[in-house]
Amino acid sequence: MAQVTQELKDSGIASGLTVGNQAPSFELPHADGTTVNLKTLLENGPVIVIFYRGGWCPYCNLELRAYQRELATIQEKGATLVAISPETPDYSLSTKEKNELDFYVLSDVDNIVARQFDLVFDMPDYLIDIYKASGLNVDAHNGNEDWQLPKPATFIIQSDGTISFSDVPADYTERVDPKTVIEKL
């Protein structure tokens, strides 16, 4: 795992959109079966968008639960919280239920939106082998055989679509504290 993290750091790939960029508009399926449109959400105020690898990732689950604990504060500040992974809607629903999440959990199958945010990388063969040997079938979770993941990332998108905060660490174990994100709203 440390090797792939170092390779991502060294390569500079999937560095993510930065502050001042316009966020790509998107419409994705929610775990509850509805469709969520970013433009519609932005009509109500800023949107915090979290990209995570999948419900199989323990770091992602910790992050999602941390945001759930801060959800009332986020909503008091007039913001909406959205979490996006490449997992199929069924797996997104499992993640939502397992973590008791009361915010949008969206499926970006094929990483279409994550790619627009410049977050997607191809998993190296040695990492695929490790995951397979441990019984983790990322391709089954994602509904394809691409073996691609988004780097975990957090963005604040203002009502005009401008990104006002961007955190895209190369190390998937490093996540920005939700309280820091709330301070930036």
Write out the residue ranges for each language-model feature:
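Short secondary-structure boundary/capping segments
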Residues: S15, L38-T40, E145-W147
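A short, polar/charged loop-to-alpha-helix boundary motif
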Residues: Y172-L185
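A generic structural motif
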Residues: P29-A31, I157
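Thiol/selenol-based redox catalytic cores and closely related redox-interacting motifs
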Residues: D108-E174
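N-terminal targeting signals for export/organelle localization
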Residues: M1-Q22
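Structural microenvironment flanking redox-active thiols in thiol-disulfide oxidoreductases
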Residues: E63-Q116
